[in-house]
């Protein structure tokens, strides 16, 4: 995919010059490029230089001012005859140049003075194409919201802004365009969709966004060579992408199962298996351990412990049901919002020029069409965004999030306690009830031969104990630090988990005591941020 993108000439602003150095400013073009209004006025008012004529390369002073967002320089040029629609040798206007670095202030000025938002260059690129090529997400959103830029416009090769953002791997721009329902299945002159181009460049995150927000149609569309995105990934040796796309194809085929189980069992789900296993183990515990005819009569103390273990098992089943059925903290979709105005365009009231928004485009969910809380994540299995998303657990067929994490912790604790009490009781009963084994025969071998049902119980009981204890320890550790599994595993991807020095910093960690107290009292840890001491 050849691009005729604007060549960005590296320019150093005055702030980057050393005290003994100054930029070489020889004419209105260099003065505009460096944003030197004083020198520009000198050239125009004393030397009689024109700001409406191009230089030897066909570039205009207003283009240089637009490129570097020099607002006052751009205003001066316009006031002195600069044409906001002046086009260079490849028909690019100052607005095209403003799109390269996302110069929103100058773009506003140009458009307010009559610049054409849909002006095209020789390649058919509009400002929205150029901004998408350079990943200027805020600029793209700004011209869409305020100036109704066509974000599905095609260049001469039939490529939309989404094609370019996917090709160059600008996931934030991809996310914004998908959020605004940009067309995903549009094929360019080579038959490629945005997903094809994301696969060709092995942009994994862009592919993930496109697949989750798309339909089966984009997965099976073929380019002019007859290749689907999956075939392209396989042919180019992109194994990770090929596996992901193959799984997505299988998931889309389970639409009938999705409809029956509300989408939760469309992918691997072990909840019925786990529920059945717990019930079977409880029955085995009663028949092969507590009331086994080939073991001595149970004592009152051991019987009490057995009853306690069974009670824990019953409570574990109750919490299992509750954590499986309870809302994990689904974020309301756009259609569920109270404000009709916000529902029409939830981005319209946000000040994207505010520095606090920088880097937070990941809050947009192109599938749910919502601006989700910072710590939330879209679950492709549940097909919903979940607040304080921890992980999707196939063993409970549900996500673990803000509203059901306490139930999940209780469930794994009860599972660990039940398996510990049951296993301990079983070992005590077998140890006391089995006579001395023959020479050369191990105790375990004797158990397997003489009490196979008890051996099966102990085997699965041990597996459950190891799994639930691991989860209990890991969940307790993360609750104490007020961090989720998703954040812990993907910390490098989240800008809010980095301090001023660029190192890992958890702004939600209020200390062991408060974190645990909040969780016990409210059922979840709070999202109040702690300001790093280094910037206080």
Swiss-Prot record:
It is an enzyme of class 2 (transferase). Its EC number is 2.3.1.225. Its main location: Golgi. The keyword Coiled coil does not apply. GO terms for cellular component: Golgi apparatus; Golgi membrane. The keyword rRNA-binding does not apply. ANK repeats lie at residues 57-86, 90-119, 123-153, 157-186, 190-219, 225-254. InterPro entries: Ankyrin_rpt, Ankyrin_rpt-contain_sf, Palmitoyltrfase_DHHC. Keywords: Acyltransferase, ANK repeat, Golgi apparatus, Lipoprotein, Membrane, Palmitate, Repeat, Transferase, Transmembrane, Transmembrane helix. Residues 363-413 form the DHHC domain. The chain crosses the membrane at residues 270-290, 298-318, 407-427, 454-474. The active site is at residue 393. Expressed in roots, shoots, flowers and pollen. It is found in: Golgi apparatus membrane. Residues 1-23 are annotated as: Disordered. It is a multi-pass membrane protein. One of its GO terms (molecular function) is protein-cysteine S-palmitoyltransferase activity. It catalyses: L-cysteinyl-[protein] + hexadecanoyl-CoA = S-hexadecanoyl-L-cysteinyl-[protein] + CoA. Residues 12-23 have a biased composition (Polar residues). It holds the Pfam family DHHC. SUPFAM superfamilies: Ankyrin repeat. Belongs to the DHHC palmitoyltransferase family. The DHHC domain is required for palmitoyltransferase activity. Palmitoyl acyltransferase. This is Probable protein S-acyltransferase 23. It comes from Arabidopsis thaliana (Mouse-ear cress). The lineage of its organism: Eukaryota, Viridiplantae, Streptophyta, Embryophyta, Tracheophyta.
């Amino acid at each position: 995919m050849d691009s005729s993108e604007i060549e960005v000439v590296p320019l150093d602003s005055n702030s980057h010059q050393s005290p003994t150095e100054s930029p070489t400013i020889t004419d209105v073009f260099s003065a505009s490029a460096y944003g030197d209004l004083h020198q520009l006025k000198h050239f125009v008012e004393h030397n009689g230089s024109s700001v409406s004529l191009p230089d030897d390369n066909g570039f205009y002073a207003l283009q240089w001012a637009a490129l570097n967002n020099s607002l006052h320089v751009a205003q001066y040029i316009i006031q002195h005859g600069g044409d906001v629609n002046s086009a260079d040798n490849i028909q690019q206007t100052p607005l095209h140049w403003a799109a390269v670095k996302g110069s929103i202030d100058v773009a506003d000025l140009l458009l307010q003075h009559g610049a054409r938002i849909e002006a095209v260059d020789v390649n058919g690129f509009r400002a929205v194409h150029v901004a998408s090529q350079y990943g200027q997400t805020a600029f793209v959103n700004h011209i869409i919201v305020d100036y109704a830029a066509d974000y599905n416009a095609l260049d001469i090769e039939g490529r939309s802004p989404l094609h370019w953002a996917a090709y160059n791997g600008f996931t934030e721009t991809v996310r914004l365009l998908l959020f605004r329902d940009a067309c995903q299945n549009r094929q360019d002159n080579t038959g490629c969709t945005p997903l094809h181009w994301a696969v060709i460049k092995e942009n994994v995150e862009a592919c993930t966004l496109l697949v989750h927000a798309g339909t089966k149609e984009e997965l099976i569309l073929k380019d002019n060579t007859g290749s689907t995105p999956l075939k392209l990934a396989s042919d180019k040796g992109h194994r990770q992408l090929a596996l992901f796309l193959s799984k997505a194809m299988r998931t889309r085929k389970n639409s009938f199962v999705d409809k029956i189980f509300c989408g939760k069992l469309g992918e691997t789900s072990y909840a019925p298996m786990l529920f059945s296993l717990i019930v079977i183990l409880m029955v085995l515990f009663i028949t092969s351990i507590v009331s086994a005819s080939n073991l001595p009569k149970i004592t009152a103390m051991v019987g009490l412990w057995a009853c306690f273990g069974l009670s824990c098992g019953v409570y574990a089943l109750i919490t299992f049901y509750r954590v499986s059925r309870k809302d994990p903290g689904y974020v309301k979709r756009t259609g569920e919002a109270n404000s009709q105005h916000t529902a029409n365009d939830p981005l319209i009231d946000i000040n994207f020029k505010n520095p606090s928004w920088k880097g937070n485009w990941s809050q947009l969910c192109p599938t749910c069409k919502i601006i989700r809380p910072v710590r939330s994540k879209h679950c492709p299995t549940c097909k919903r965004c979940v607040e304080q998303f921890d992980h999707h657990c196939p063993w409970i067929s549900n996500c673990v999030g803000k509203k059901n994490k306490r139930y999940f912790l209780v469930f794994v604790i009860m599972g660990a306690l039940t398996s510990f009490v049951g296993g301990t009781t079983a070992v005590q009963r077998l140890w006391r009830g089995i006579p001395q084994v023959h020479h050369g025969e191990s105790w375990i071998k004797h158990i397997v031969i003489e009490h196979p049902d008890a051996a099966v119980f102990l085997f699965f009981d041990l597996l459950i104990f190891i799994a639930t204890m691991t989860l209990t320890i890991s969940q307790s550790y993360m609750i104490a630090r007020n961090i989720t599994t998703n954040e812990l595993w993907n910390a490098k991807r989240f800008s809010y988990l980095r301090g001023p020095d660029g190192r890992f910093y958890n702004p939600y960690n209020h200390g062991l005591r408060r974190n645990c107290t909040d969780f016990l009292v409210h059922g979840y840890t709070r999202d109040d941020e702690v300001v790093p001491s280094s910037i206080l």
